[in-house]
Amino acid sequence: MKVRLAKTAAFCMGVRRAMEMVLTEANKGKGSISTFGPLIHNKQVIDLLESKGVTSINDIDEFNEGTLVIRAHGIPPDQRKALRESGLRLIDATCRRVARVQSIIRYHTKKGYTAIIVGDRDHPEVIGLLGYGNGRAHVINSLEEVSRIPDTEKVFLVAQTTQDEEKYRDIIEAVMARFPDALTFDTICDATINRQKEIRSFIGQVDAVVVVGGYHSGNTKRLVQISQEAGLPTFHVETEKDLDKERLSSMEVIGVTAGASTPNWMIKNVVQEIEAIRTRQETFFGRWIKNAFKFMLLSNLLVAFGGFALAHAASVLSGRTPDLIHPCLALLYIYAMHVLNRFLDKGASTYNDPERASFYRRHRVFLILSGFFSMIGALALSYYLGTTIFFAIAGLSILGIIYSLPIVPVSLRHLWRYSKIKDIPGSKTLSVALAWGVLISLLPLLEPTSLAWPAAILSFLFVFSIVYVRSALFDIFQVQGDLIVGVETLPIVLGEKRTLHLLKWIILCGALLLSLAALTKVVGPFSWLLLLVFFSFTLCLIIYQKRWLYPGTRLEAMVEGNFFLAGLLALLWQIFS
């Protein structure tokens, strides 16, 4: 079944910030931590936080010591004052958009204005906003309630940040008709507006809409309401288990969106479950092709064959005579390391890629055995190439295995917070890129050949740069799961925006280096052709940034496809040069 996923389906800025603050604090493991009220309205996320030792309290007397986090919805000023006087360490995770509305209300009510808040009376955000009204605030939730606003000279309007934009506009018109001098403020969050617009854009494009989010989440329920009012068959689900597969099976294209407090892994689970539903029009052959491709991707065979293709391209770039031994060595080593490290580090994949985690559980024996025999095969091939290469591959294999294993004794961990190599911030991306570069470009220098060092070094830098970009891009896709388990990958250390900026610079520098090497005759003119690989990676970055594709099977396959592009260019160069 085809799925059209909304570009805006993910945590909003405020929820993401609150989650990052809480998880970062929880991963430090320094004392107890609680949130003052549920951090966000999503049962699965709250359960996750509880598994990390983060509890939720509603009364300050329930918490005596430790760190207390103010929820994303914000709280009234009298509660904030009480928390400050409690002596507890406070972390303010109030959404910045909510804080702006609080400031508007506080400022104008002090000037003698009466605040009209358009929102849900019982919602925590609205309760907090009322507290800033200095006794001069009223809440309304419909056009009918405009007539109940007390007569007053100075009025201003604000909205709960997750309100329906069209409804707010209608209420503004009604209030302006009664209070012509009323001040109005656009306080609905951009993320909320964009989600609502995208729901309406589904009209005529999809057969039905699935909205993923908590049953008690106000903004999620509003998306459901907007979808229903647009005349679209609408299904509100919390998890993939809530899907009505029987009804969905009669449809062809399903639109999927999610509330602002719905994490990526829940959206992925729902999307994958919908995609797995067989429609009446789907052919056996088409389904077989799709399943075969997915098997290649989930089993890491796709990235391994990508390594094969990249090794062939690197041999042509460095001036070596292309053969099958070196690409096969790369294929076997890369497959073994990816598979075995998946089993050694299962935590983050549960959240980053639930489908792959499930695949690994189902095919555990096959994958472990195939990974083990791939390593044996890599060692056998390396021995054929010489004892020096054999020991080099053995060393790389040992480093690859211990990457995910604790190497610092428990008794010494109080002196050094990183017990594993992978715990070192940013080490994952760097380690993968170095391993690929050494394996594909530098190991051949240990063989008794007349390979030129400058060409080999350039080949190493080419492989290192594109593998680094690939690994960092996957780290961006997987940031939520890594944050949950406490892995400090590059995007967590630098932030997504800076990481993407860094990747663009790496692509630019790599392209300039290839061009310079071709101009100075360090390598042959084939390097001009490889500029297409950097262009293709740039396209992948743009596709992600513009949200033309959501992180998932198709985008991952597109990223991995860059290695095959390099191999194809090398093959074409051999044929036609």
Spell out what each predicted region is:
Residues 287-294, 351-361, 417-420, 486-495, ...:
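Short juxtamembrane and helix-loop transition motifs at transmembrane-helix boundaries
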Residues 309-329, 378-391, 441-461, 515-526, ...:
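Helix-coil boundary and interhelical linker segments in multi-pass alpha-helical membrane proteins
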Residues 356, 421-422, 527-577:
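Extended hydrophobic alpha-helices typical of membrane-associated regions
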Residues 358-447, 541-550:
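Intramembrane alpha-helical segments
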